[in-house]
Amino acid sequence: MTDALIFLAPGYEEVEMLTVVDMVRRAGLVIDMVSITDTLEVTSSHNVTIKADKLFKEADFDSAKMIILPGGIPGTPNLLAYKPLTDKILEFKENGKLLSAVCAAPTVYGQLGILKGHKATCYPGQEVNLNCAEYLTEPVVIDGQFTTSRGMGTCLLYTSDA
């Protein structure tokens, strides 16, 4: 049984991803690192290769309560471009499950149009892509089923809140 799924796309931000995974596991929850590529090994924006726990097709979406998206460039655009993931994000939204994202990644939710009517935050300069009701400069914003965070420097606070 999986509590959360965090997705690795080529070019993800490794500190954001690993901080979230580490803190969630320290809290005693099950989080799976899921590759959206055809291999478990995924390389970050800073050329660090990490082995995911599962491929996308193996992820346990039924038991997962939360989707988490780490930021990074080109990781964030790669997440948005992966239709199987965006379909699952829309399904989670419809079913009232939790959606969470750090740094530039909240813009994935924004570009899917699901942040409308919600408050959110993201990496400074990316807010034009949030398409939300209200952009906040807080380190972490929780609004309904969404938790968003500004970036790498806010990850410890983010994981304690999420």
Task: Please place each PLM-identified region on the residue numbering.
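Flexible gly/pro-rich beta->alpha loop and the following alpha-helix that scaffold active-site loops
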Residues: 32, 36-96
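Phosphate-binding/catalytic loops
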Residues: 98, 140-152
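Extreme N-terminal starter segment of soluble prokaryotic enzymes
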Residues: 1-5
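Conserved small/polar residues in nucleotide/adenosyl-binding loops
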Residues: 158-162
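Short N-terminal binding/cap micro-motifs at the start of the first secondary-structure element
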Residues: 12-17
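Catalytic nucleophile loop
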Residues: 67-71, 89-115, 120
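A short, Lys/Arg-enriched amphipathic alpha-helix followed by its capping loop at the start of a domain
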Residues: 20-29
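A conserved active-site-flanking secondary-structure segment within enzyme catalytic domains
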Residues: 115-140
